[in-house]
Amino acid sequence: VYVPAHFALTDAECVGILTRMGAGDLVTVHAGEDGTPEPDVTFLPWEYVPGPGAAASEEAGGGEVGGGLGSLVGHLARNNPQVRRPVIGPATVVVHGGDHYVSPVDLPSHDEGGRVVPTWDYVTVHVHGELTVHDDPAWILDSMRPLTTRHEEDWAAGDPRGQASGAAPTWAVDDAPQDFVDRMLRAVVGVELRITRLVGKAKMSQNKTPADVAGEIAALEARGLTQLAAYKRDVSLPAAQRRHDLLADLRDRR
């Protein structure tokens, strides 16, 4: 992925996205029938597992992740060809953050000469690593519990029943009958991506004028896209202001 310096995310910022992620695309390469490499892609929910020492690095306030980058854990149908064929080289998980269309009509620059075009803003993290397939039912079950718990808690947080009673109902793997769970476990395999490299990109208008970023924020808020608006207010607007001030300083020195 092409990442200009002003759009690049640090490893710590990438990990922050992984800890909140829902799902992402597992991308692998396999030998086709004629030996030609063929990509394969499956969209999966993932659980981020920090590497050893990551918590200590976070407490120290470091900008990078210490003690290893950790891993992503997920599950695939046992009959999925993606896990039945040998993988060539490393695998990648593509994580999609927020994204949205940017219309010129929302930007003050549109009314100040019209030198503006539409674009698409987005946040993404490409997670590279070595993929391991796990066939042990105990490993698969142990990896399902935290994944299910996290997403159940996230889902329950928006449940009107919880807002009314103070506690929304949630589901746990152990709620299901054991024979049913055993049958389900036989139908899947576990996949673990041991992370070797993170590439993060936030193309979120940091290179625009502060006025244009403010226009985008207003447009997002008007459409109820509050999380995207908050990101641009907290990250993009300060970056745009720093860029504006730097360019103004350089002009003054000429």
Which residues does each PLM region occupy?
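Hydrophobic, proline/glycine-rich low-complexity stretches
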Residues: 1-22
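Catalytic micro-motifs at enzyme active sites that drive phosphoryl/nucleotidyl and oxygen chemistry
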Residues: 13, 28-35, 82-83, 113-116, ...
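A short, structural micro-pattern
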Residues: 20, 40, 68, 87-88, ...
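Short beta-strand segments
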Residues: 21-78, 93, 104
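Short loop/turn segments at secondary-structure transitions that flank enzyme active sites
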Residues: 32, 50-52, 80, 99-101, ...
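Short, structured beta-strand-loop surface elements
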Residues: 65, 77-143
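Beta-strand secondary-structure signal
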Residues: 73, 92, 128, 190-194
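C-terminal edge-of-domain segments
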Residues: 132-254
